[in-house]
């Protein structure tokens, strides 16, 4: 008797079934590989591994992801002071936000809501709710507003290590006008760890982002939040988002302390001109405006000295320093390396907390 043929999705495959004791057996490798899965064998563990990738085409997957995530993205509108050529005046401001808690907490950009006197959140279904500002941190450009509504659909967060240049992403937000609420644009991750005049690193994307998209969601093809869309260069495909690792850091600080407890060294730092242009530099950070009671001054360092390392991690830009400081709290002790009079000296200092005015 000839071996039975095997079909996967209506197509015959090269693997034949085997009949033993009137029972039909089909080799899994051939079936799974024909279905687009990766099959591997671990000799040491004597186990088979099957990695099933998403079999949907882009034309099917993208609408599915948008449909899943869109209810978690909201529009934000409010009245407040706006600055223009003609001075300060009352106006209407708008942006986007992402639901992060079923009990009504919504994440957005700080610059979207910081000047709003009244805040209205408009859901995907068009329903509006008054909101209150709960947390804000302008250094990371993140804020949380809260509405009196429960049972909301929340966005899932991606893992930072899964954010890779070239991967496809979708931006969902409310560009330009509320008649375009929850618009979606598709693009790719263009770059990571971008420093573009902001205190912290950003994710770069070629996804179209415009006025009103700020505070919206940048998501991957698994429907997970990659970042909060924040800024871009007008008329280009060069746009940016606050990455999910910074989002997680800030939300954790909000939960623990009601604010982000930023670190202060009690001094201003000047980058090398190459670092200011985004060119790799090993010049360190020149100390300026050193306060007499600052941790660095207490360690006998002075203006004009150069900070080169913190806990043996080389520091060559302000963004690098700020990113490293996300691992510390005020009151922690760190070892700094400072070039003074042509010689690198090391000292343990206790970190201060940054004041609001710094």
Please give the residue ranges for each predicted region.
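Primary recognition of N-terminal secretory signal peptides and signal-anchoring hydrophobic helices
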Residues: 1-55
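Conserved active-site neighborhood of the chymotrypsin/trypsin-like protease fold
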Residues: 56, 81, 101-179, 199-201, ...
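Short, flexible surface segments
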Residues: 70, 96, 102, 115, ...
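Terminal peptide-recognition signature
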Residues: 71-76, 97, 104-108, 131, ...
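PDZ/PDZ-like groove recognition
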Residues: 80-83, 89-92, 208, 255-324, ...
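Active-site loop architecture of trypsin-fold serine endopeptidases
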Residues: 82-86, 90-92, 116-119, 152-154, ...
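Short, acidic, Ser/Thr-enriched surface-loop or helix-capping motifs
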Residues: 94, 100-101, 123, 128, ...
